[in-house]
């Protein structure tokens, strides 16, 4: 009876065969990129030809070292190993190395980085710096032993002796060259005594010149405070450093000429021209001054010099008169001021104040006496009037005149409305009192 395998068992067997097959451990494969969408980490896509498709994976660390970006439809050559993914039973190739098919990877990387930096604006003319007319010290980032530095020194010395050349010895090709170039550009920018920077190397293949296409070098040039001249390779060679630099020179000699736009002979010719212009200007000024002196010597002032100061003498006389008048007015004003101040001092004297206060006190004393007499008389009259009013209210005086006073419970009855039938009342009379009982109450019509 046949034994049936599980799917897992079969898949594990196939995976083992794939893993141990020497032909699948290192596969050289060519195909077209399909279903590619760039991810921030690992890259997953397909490789296909006209009749088949295989899934492909590039781990993040490998992809970052490719030097170019994959694109949909790009044909590439890859080296990798084939493996089986057990959960789905599918197989794929794990890519360890890749390069474009046909066109070199460096050319693609060049165009991709150029496009990226162009979109960022690094190559725009508005960022270009003007080169100085007169540089006292020029920095050069290049190889110590190459012909570049010799050509630059020779050309600068010939065109303008006295300009200092400061070399930053740099590896210009191979591994680590780009980092060293960028580092020396940054070092040069730390100095305050440099006016200009030249970076370059001699000719070579695209691989030899590649360090000057690296992003780290391009950004270092863009961020440079110093103006930068790029002189990389021959006239037909073009690097990204040329695009971002402030000026591009086809040769080291041309770079040195750009760095010294004004030569020693130009300066001498300029000085000679300036000397001629100065001599001409001095002669013209001297001639004009001589002509002016001649005219002055023929003027009335020179023939009759006293007329020069006649007006000033008249002005002096007028000022003297005005000064005397001003002094008289000032003295008169001051006298009046002294008199006014003297009068004020007299008024402010303690003796004067005391006399004034004594006079005022006498007046107030007399006024107080008269006012007190008036108040006293008024109070006496008021007391007499009140006394008479009190006498009029005395009950003994009322009954003495024949009147009687009616009281109810010790209260004086002043109206029949306060009484009612059978109330007990007391009748006060001149010689005694009578106890009565009210028999009837009659109200008098008014």
Curated annotation (Swiss-Prot):
Heterooligomer composed of large and small subunits. Its main location: cytoplasm. One of its GO terms (molecular function) is exodeoxyribonuclease VII activity. Bidirectionally degrades single-stranded DNA into large acid-insoluble oligonucleotides, which are then degraded further into small acid-soluble oligonucleotides. It is found in: Cytoplasm. GO terms for biological process: DNA catabolic process. PANTHER family: EXODEOXYRIBONUCLEASE 7 LARGE SUBUNIT. Belongs to the XseA family. This is Exodeoxyribonuclease 7 large subunit. NCBIfam families: xseA. It catalyses: Exonucleolytic cleavage in either 5'- to 3'- or 3'- to 5'-direction to yield nucleoside 5'-phosphates. The keyword Methyltransferase does not apply. It comes from Streptococcus pneumoniae serotype 4 (strain ATCC BAA-334 / TIGR4). Its EC number is 3.1.11.6. Keywords: Cytoplasm, Exonuclease, Hydrolase, Nuclease. One of its GO terms (cellular component) is cytoplasm. It is an enzyme of class 3 (hydrolase).
């Amino acid at each position: 009876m046949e034994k049936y395998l599980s799917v897992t068992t079969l898949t594990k067997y196939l995976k083992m065969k794939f893993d141990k097959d020497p032909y699948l451990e290192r596969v050289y494969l060519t195909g077209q990129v399909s279903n590619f969408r760039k991810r921030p980490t690992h890259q997953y896509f397909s490789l296909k030809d006209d009749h088949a498709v295989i899934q492909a994976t590039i781990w993040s660390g490998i992809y970052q070292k490719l030097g170019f970006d994959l694109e949909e439809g790009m044909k590439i050559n890859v080296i990798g190993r084939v493996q089986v993914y057990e959960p789905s039973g599918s197989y794929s190739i794990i890519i360890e190395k890749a390069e474009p098919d046909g066109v070199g990877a460096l050319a693609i990387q060049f165009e991709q980085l150029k496009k990226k930096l162009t979109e960022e604006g690094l190559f725009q003319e508005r960022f270009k710096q003007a080169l100085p007319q007169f540089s006292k010290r020029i920095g050069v980032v290049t190889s110590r032993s190459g012909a570049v530095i010799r050509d630059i020194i020779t050309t600068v010395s010939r065109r303008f002796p006295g300009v200092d050349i400061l070399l930053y010895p740099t590896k210009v090709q191979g591994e680590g060259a780009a980092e060293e170039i960028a580092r020396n550009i940054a070092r040069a920018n730390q100095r305050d005594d440099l006016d200009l920077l030249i970076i370059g190397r001699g000719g070579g293949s695209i691989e030899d010149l590649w360090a000057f296409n690296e992003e780290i070098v391009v950004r270092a040039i863009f961020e440079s405070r110093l103006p930068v001249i790029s002189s990389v390779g021959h006239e037909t060679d073009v690097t990204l450093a040329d695009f971002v630099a402030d000026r591009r020179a086809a040769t080291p000699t041309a770079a040195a000429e750009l760095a010294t736009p004004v030569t020693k002979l130009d300066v001498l010719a300029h000085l000679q021209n300036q000397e001629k212009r100065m001599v001409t200007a001095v002669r013209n000024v001297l001639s004009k001054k001589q002509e002016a002196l001649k005219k002055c010597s023929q003027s009335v002032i020179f023939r009759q010099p006293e007329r020069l100061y006649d007006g000033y003498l008249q002005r002096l006389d007028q000022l003297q008169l005005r000064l005397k008048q001003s002094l008289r007015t000032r003295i008169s004003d001051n006298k009046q001021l002294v008199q006014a101040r003297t009068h004020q001092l007299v008024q402010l004297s303690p003796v004067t104040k005391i006399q004034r206060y004594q006079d005022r006190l006498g007046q107030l004393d007399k006024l107080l006496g008269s006012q007190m007499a008036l108040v006293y008389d008024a109070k006496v009259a008021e007391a007499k009037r009140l006394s008479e009013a009190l006498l009029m209210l005395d009950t003994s005086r009322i009954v003495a005149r024949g009147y009687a006073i009616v009281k109810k419970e010790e209260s004086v009855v002043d109206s029949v409305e306060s009484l009612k039938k059978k109330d007990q009342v007391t009748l006060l009379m001149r010689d005694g009192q009578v106890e009565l009982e009210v028999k009837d109450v009659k109200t008098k019509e008014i």
